[in-house]
Every structure is written in C-alpha cells, then in structure tokens.
Amino acid sequence: MRLLLWWVLVLSLFLDPLRAVEEHETDAVDLFLIFNQINQLNQVIETYKKNPERSAEISLYNTQKNDLIKSLTSKVLNERDKIGIDINQNLKEQEKIKKRLSKSIKGDDFYTFMKDRLSLDILLIDETLYRFIDKIRSSIDIFSEQKDVESISDAFLLRLGQFKLYTFPKNLGNVKMHELEQMFSDYELRLNTYTEVLRYIKNHPKEVLPKNLIMEVNMDFVLNKISKVLPFTAHSLQVSKIALALMILALLLGLRKLITWLLALLLDRIFEIMQRNKKMHVNVQSSIVSPVSVFLALFSCDVALDIFYYPNASPPKVSMWVGAVYIMLLAWLVIALFKGYGEALVTNVATKSTHNFRKEVINLILKVVYFLIFIVALLGVLKQLGFNVSAIIASLGIGGLAVALAVKDVLANFFASVILLLDNSFSQGDWIVCGEVEGTVVEMGLRRTTIRAFDNALLSVPNSELAGKPIRNWSRRKVGRRIKMEIGLTYSSSQSALQLCVKDIKEMLENHPKIANGADSALQNASDYRYMFKKDIVSIDDFLGYKNNLFVFLDQFADSSINILVYCFSKTVVWEEWLEVKEDVMLKIMGIVEKHHLSFAFPSQSLYVESLPEVSLKEGAKI
C-alpha cells in the first residue's frame, strides 16, 4: 500500500512539470501539547462540575476532549509527530531532585521535601508517557494485532497506578499549603489525564494499529501535491481525497490479474504440484480471480474511506462491517485455493500410500475441511460483529437442550435441510424419486421441500423425510440413458444367421452417432482439471454420471423365441431425444433382422394331432 501511495505521488509530480519539486512537509504535531490540551479540558470540566450554573457546558468540553483523544490516538504511531518530551532533560532533572531528596529529611522541612517529591513524580509520569509512546512506535507494525497494543497499555497503566496520592499536615502556613495543594492538584490531574488516554488506547487498539499503511505515509504531502495538480480551488482537500481514492481504486483493480498470477505462481512454488501442467495453472488462476478481484475492490474502498476520514479513523461500525466482509472473502479465497491445490495435495498423498488406503477417508477429509472453513468463517464474522462467541457456544448447552425438546420436529427439518445442502443430493429443477414421491424439485426451504409432480400437483415434503430415505436423482446424468430390450427370433432361425445378426447389431450400435461408447467418458469430456486428481479417489464416470456400456449377446431360449439381449446407453439424457434415438435403433434392428432372413417371434402355441376320426360330410362324402 505504501508503494501504491508513493506511485500516486510520483504520478502527481509528473503531471506538474512546470513546478519545481519542493520538499514540503507540514509542521509536525507535538503530542505532548495535545496531552496538555486534554489536561486543560479536564481541569475546566472539574471546575464546572463544582458550579451547577456551568454544568450544561460540560458535555461540550467532553466532546472536545474526546475528539482530541481520538486525534492523539491516530497520531501515536506516526513517527513524524514529535512526542514533545525532552527525555534527556527530564532524566537530568530527576537526578538533581533525587540528590536533593537524598540529602534532605522529611521531618526537617516538609514543604521543601514534598515540593521536590511532587516535582519528581511529575517528571516520572512524563517519562512513563514518553516510554509508552516510544514502546508503541518500536513494537507495533503492520503485522501487529490488537492484543499487542492491549498488553503494552496494560503494562504502562500498571506503572501509572503505582504513583502515590499524598496528604498534607494542617500545621503548614496558608501560602505553603496552597502552593503544595496546587502542585498536587496539577500532579493528580496530569496522572488522571495520562491514565484516561492510555485506557482509551487499550480499549480502542484498532485506532492505533496501522490501517492499510496510511499511517506510514505523509498523507498531507500527498494530498497537497494532488491539490496543486487539479484545477479546483474550492474544497481542494475534499477533491484531492476523492482523486486519490479513485486512482488507488483504478490501480488496484488494474493490477488484479497480475496479483492473481503472482499468487498462483507462489503457491505453485510452495506445493510443486502443478508446475508442469500449464492448463491446470490457468484453471486455478481463473478460479481465484473472482475472490481476489472482490477483495481488491473492497480493499480499495477501505483505503478510500480512510482517506476521506483522514486524519481521523473510520467510524467503528464501518470498520466492523468491512472486517466481516474481509473474513467472508478470505474464506471464499481459501476454499477456491483448496479446491485447486488442496485436493491435488491430498490425492498425491493417497496415491503414494499403500494400496490398503481407503479412498472414502479422503472424501471425508475434504468434506470436513470445507465444513471447518465454513464454521471458522461464521464464528469469525460473528465475533467481528460484536457477538460473544463463547456465550453462543455455551448457550447451546442446557438451554439449547430445552429448546430442542420443545421444537424437535422443527429442528429435525432444519438440520435435515443443512444435511441435504451439504450432501448436495439434489438441486432445484432436478427430477427425483423418494419413496412414493416423484417429480421436479421446485424449492428447498428450511422446513420442507416443494416438488412438482408429473400430474402437475404440488407436493410439500418435510426435509427430515427426504434426508432419511434413499433419493433417486434422474437429473444427475451427463451422458447415458439406458436402452434395454429383448429381441425374440423364431426357433426356425439358423445358428449362423443368429451369429451374423448379433454381430451386425453390435457393429450398428458401436458406430451409431447417438449411442454412447468408450470415448464418452468423464475424463475425456470433463473440462475441470480437478477431476484428474479425483480419478484416484472415486470412479469419475459414476461420480459425474457417465455410462457407456454396450452389450449385444444371445441371451435366452424362451418358450416361444430365441432372445437377443441389447443393452446400451444413448448419449443424450433428455427424454424426447432418448425416445428418438431408441426409435432409430429399433428400426435399424428390424432392417438387420430382415437382412438375414430372420423372423420376429411372438407368443404362440403349436398343436400336434396324431390321428383324426372319419367325419361324414354332405352328400355322403368321406374324409
């Protein structure tokens, strides 16, 4: 991101050749001055709390103070802004006071002793503040997490909590007492102010962490250079922000294919699986283009929002929702990468194992991994949105049991719908048979699935019933709808004629353009590169729905015929087209039967009479 912003800076300088390049830096902010401003506001607020007439103004000063704290928090990590505390001078002053305290006795001159003691404590809390900011700047970078900021804040809050609160004897003079009380008031106010700011940083660590590396770049300088290039005078800062955001958006989207290619190349080098297969590399690259493109678009919008709100942080709700979308996009990208490389990796492990390795285990591993990715992403989104994930999981205990008993059937249907979705048993528009139910799936809901029967009746089937019974899905066929028939020929057929008839029928089917053969297999026709790995896990033909068996044999001596079995599959699975193919096959079989002078047999019965009695006919004729 820093390189992108510097690229924009160079572009803006290139577009302004008539101007000499001037090193322009905005005045650095003194963080200690901001602390003092917050301290002064706290002093005013404490004063107004004692005056009921001014209490209405407290909210206004609180708003100003909160704005200053937010601004200060956003600048803590920016090393261009001075801390504002001369730590060397501070340490020298501490040494001087410590020497005086070591020589003085509290009982001899209480006023001088307490004055030095308070001065030393003020220097110590200033040093603590300096050490805190220095620790943040040296320890926090773009890879740091919220817990890192929280742990540093906790450590320095503990140090501030160790400073003492003092009480003064009443035998001091009014002037000295007033002076000590004033010093103590300043000391206490400063201690409370520092504590308040550190607690805010601890509770809002996101505002300290680098956001898209914008905190690392001189945004004032970049926006200033852009405003000089643009021909606008009014609202130049806002226009510069919009221009910078649009340039970053266009640049990131323009680089998406390059970034995708580099990511795929990096993964190839890591896994060393697909380096020799250029087609697979292209397919994997195309599968991750969509999530990477959406991620870059969201990232660009996120950067644009940071620029719009600069120098303040983006609203917490915006950051919350953007973070949730980031998690979902990350899950999408991980699933896409796992489908490309994960299956190949697992398959390679399986093929290198012994022959006793069960292929079902690989399928189970793949499904479990997909499910875990989904669950982790879901929990991450819930946590990002502010839900207490631990409480949600705990609530699934006793309370969940009571609810489950009350709505057992509803939950059964709901979880059945989840199982059906995960199993992918059918989709909308599929022709299925489940028990006595047959028809086309219209819609699958959380409780029931609606099916349109072939008599046009609408059936509503509970999901639990579908999940608990075998489902026959006729639509999950790519190539191959069965044609099976028995061809009965008369017993008067000769052996040679039958053999030639069987041979010709088989040759006709093998050469038929619409009958499936050995070339119609999944590996020959499937374009998805992943199936080359799945062939070692499952039968790809059965997995995708390819059937190309072809059998023609003399099958049976029936009561009235000699039967020839014809068993084959049409290439099409569409009913009407299948009927046309079947009709064509039957007509060609009839031609082959006629060619060999054979006859179709039909159910018949022969009656043999050994002798007949004489029968008298008209006019005395005899037989």
From Swiss-Prot:
Keywords in alphabetical order: Cell membrane, Membrane, Transmembrane, Transmembrane helix
Localization annotation: Cell membrane
Source taxon at top rank: Bacteria
InterPro entries, alphabetized: LSM_dom_sf, MS_channel_1st, MS_channel_C, MscS_beta-dom_sf, MscS_channel_2nd, MscS_channel_C_sf, MscS_channel_CS, MscS_channel_TM-2
GO biological process, one term: transmembrane transport
TM region(s), chain numbering: 242-262, 288-308, 318-338, 361-381, 387-407
Topology of the protein relative to the lipid bilayer: Multi-pass membrane protein
GO cellular component: plasma membrane
Family: Belongs to the MscS (TC 1.A.23) family.
Record protein name field: Uncharacterized MscS family protein jhp_0969
Species annotation: Helicobacter pylori (strain J99 / ATCC 700824) (Campylobacter pylori J99)
